[in-house]
């Protein structure tokens, strides 16, 4: 199969088309900023909903005594309308990783495979996939003392740290989640996000402000037409 031609917009950044994750994110942000319009998102009532409709396993009894937190797509339901995702991701300190796996195995969970990053994909007795991520992030200790709860009462990563993770990801879905969550965040929450990003990834501040702009623009009420 012939390779796709590299579009001129991308070729100006990476002639061979091999964008870094940060370059890829910048291209997406630039396109969105050119196209975003007030009120292009869902209704305000829908956007305010926080639900826990999807029945993810409750790991609290199994992992009692160990610090853990939900990350990934399931975590976003604490900050925006719930969306479908194929599995539940949890983040634990790498020093607790083997203990977490052992506790889950004792509860009937099975290891499917190793993850591309440090950790394991596991399957619950009901067939639900759980990705157990062993974390060594410089912000991990701070994050674990600033936990939030989702509508089901499960421990969820705080918004600033979820933004850090999703901004470092390579999927457009992650960046869409970021702009939506930021668009729905309060001024106080945005200042908390800015402070954490400035501390841990200051090189991402410009992109963060762009994603805030896009998210807030989508939440604006469109102008009425006579």
List where the protein language model places each region.
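Compositionally biased terminal segments of proteins
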Residues: 2-226
């Amino acid at each position: 199969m012939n390779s796709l031609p590299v579009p001129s917009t991308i070729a100006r950044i990476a002639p061979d088309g091999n964008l870094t994750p940060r370059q890829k994110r910048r291209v997406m942000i630039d396109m969105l900023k050119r196209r975003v319009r007030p009120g292009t998102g869902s209704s305000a009532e829908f956007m305010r909903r926080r639900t826990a409709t999807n029945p993810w396993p409750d790991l609290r009894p199994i992992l009692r005594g160990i610090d853990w937190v939900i990350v990934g797509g399931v975590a976003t339901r604490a900050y925006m309308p719930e969306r479908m995702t194929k599995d539940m991701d949890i983040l634990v300190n790498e020093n607790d990783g083997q203990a977490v796996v052992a506790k889950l195995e004792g509860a009937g969970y099975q290891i499917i495979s190793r993850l591309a990053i440090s950790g394991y994909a596991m399957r619950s007795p009901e067939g639900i996939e759980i990705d157990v991520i062993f974390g060594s992030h410089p912000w991990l200790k701070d994050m674990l003392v600033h936990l939030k709860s989702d509508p089901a009462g499960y421990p969820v990563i705080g918004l600033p740290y979820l933004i850090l993770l999703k901004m470092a990801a390579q999927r457009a879905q992650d960046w869409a989640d970021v702009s939506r969550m930021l668009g729905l965040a309060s001024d106080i929450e945005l200042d908390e996000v800015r402070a954490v990003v400035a501390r841990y990834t200051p090189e991402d501040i410009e992109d963060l402000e762009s994603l805030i702009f896009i998210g807030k623009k989508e939440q604006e009420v469109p102008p009425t037409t006579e």
